[in-house]
Amino acid sequence: MEFSCTLTLKELLESGAHFGHQTSRWNPRMKPFIFEEKNGLYIIDLAKTLAQLKKAVACIQTTIGQEKSILFVGTKKQAKQIIREAAIECGEFFASERWLGGMLTNMATIRNSVKTLNRIELDLEASNSGLTKKELALLAKRHRKLLNNLEGVRHMNSLPGLLIVIDPGYERIAVAEAGKLGIPVMALVDTNCDPTPINHVIPCNDDSMKSIRLIVNVLKDAVIDAKKRLGVEILSPVRPAERPAEEAVEELPLPTGEAQDEASSKEGVLLWADIDNCEALK
């Protein structure tokens, strides 16, 4: 039995997934996914979000069935910890700190950086390296920087079969690299983004941690389910000894004057009756 997306419109609404950006900051190409304009904000059609999410789940299961890997990409503050945790749990690769140019189009350079990281670790572990305390401290600092940037792709030895991106506008370099190589892109897309380069659009609020977490968890569960059904072992892309010290990430307030404000957020519950009519707008 295949994985079934059980997410509901009510859950999406409660997470704030319906809040788009101010009407002055929209991308007209997102019009098919917009339900209405309210108080200067565009409201995303959550019925279409749910429909697109179900298609995304099917795409993920196909990718896993073809024995291809997935690369989760989300480097902005609201997404990075969610992306990292989800990728580790489902055993896929991730880029959560920064996108290194050429991560896909120039993998040889990235692999060389990984080799450098491995050499530094050997030097730090060696008791007879002959390095001074100052040199060891500088080496440790360089190690932390490399590990932060390469942690999620350290063991990615071939191109992924799918990119899952949070905010393709913010991650435009990653999307462009995937496009050049013909790698399909699945993305959480807000009303200010261009959906054209995206193969699988999931329209939603990509600025709210609650919204991001809710949707990413569905995608993560789809990966786990597909692997279990196929008998594929779930291996974390990060080995325990490789993990850097984790930083706490606080829930961010909704950005005022940019995406949505608290006043509009509180009105969200009033939109529940309207959501019942979303199907009529398809």
Curated annotation (Swiss-Prot):
GO biological process: any one? translation
A single GO molecular-function term is: structural constituent of ribosome
Question: One Gene Ontology cellular component annotation?
Answer: cytosolic small ribosomal subunit
* CDD domains in the record: RPS2
Cite the entry's keywords alphabetically: Ribonucleoprotein, Ribosomal protein
Q: Which domain of life is it from?
A: Bacteria
Query: Where is the segment annotated Disordered?
Result: 245-266
Task: Answer yes or no on keyword Ribosomal protein.
Answer: yes
Family statement: Belongs to the universal ribosomal protein uS2 family.
PANTHER family given in the database record: 30S RIBOSOMAL PROTEIN S2 PROKARYOTIC AND ORGANELLAR, SMALL RIBOSOMAL SUBUNIT PROTEIN US2M
In Swiss-Prot or TrEMBL terms, this protein is called: Small ribosomal subunit protein uS2
